[in-house]
Amino acid sequence: PVLRHFEGARRRAEKKFLNGVGISTADFRAIDNDAELTAALKEFGGSGILKTRRLGYDGKGQRVFRNMDTGGFSGTCEAMGNVPLILESFVAFEREISVIAGRGLDGSIAAYDPAENVHRDGILHTSTLPAGISHETAAAAQAAVAKVLAALDYVGVIGVEFFVLADGSLIANEMAPRVHNS
């Protein structure tokens, strides 16, 4: 891919970009120390996923907090490597999908149908086509990816993961500036 204005694998910048073009993401907070983690976990009701802001895949560079009290996290940031982190709120989703699309130099866009992804232990286990979603949800996912490609003036292939909520609406999870592993 030819990358223009794309900070892929930088989760905070990615989520800010997605929100800026009107694509919803999970709530998130930048975390640089244990005090910020404690405050953000309190804000998110004691639950969330702490991730490194750069790199990390298949559950690597992540720590899950579920229904935790909001104290006693001393040393968490150090244990994560003292790197910039992001805490994402949990999303009550029915399934995860991904769309792989490409954009040409002329601005034309082609997108595959969404694949439905199932993970085991944080690692992608299966991707199924067609995804068990409505035509409207599939079209909305493809339109969101087209919006990303156009906003970035991106030329090449991209993969975008989404959480599908009970009402069929979408929450973007992450982008990959390449063919997605699904």
Q: Where do the language-model regions lie?
A:
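Conserved protein kinase catalytic/activation segment
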Residues: 168-170
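Short glycine-rich anion-binding loops that position phosphate/pyrophosphate groups of nucleotides
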Residues: 54-55, 102, 178
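Conserved N-proximal alpha/beta basic substrate-recognition cap immediately N-terminal to
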Residues: 1-44, 48, 55-57
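Internal nucleotide-binding/catalytic subdomain
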Residues: 65-160, 164-166
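Glycine-rich phosphate/pyrophosphate-binding beta-alpha loops
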Residues: 176-182
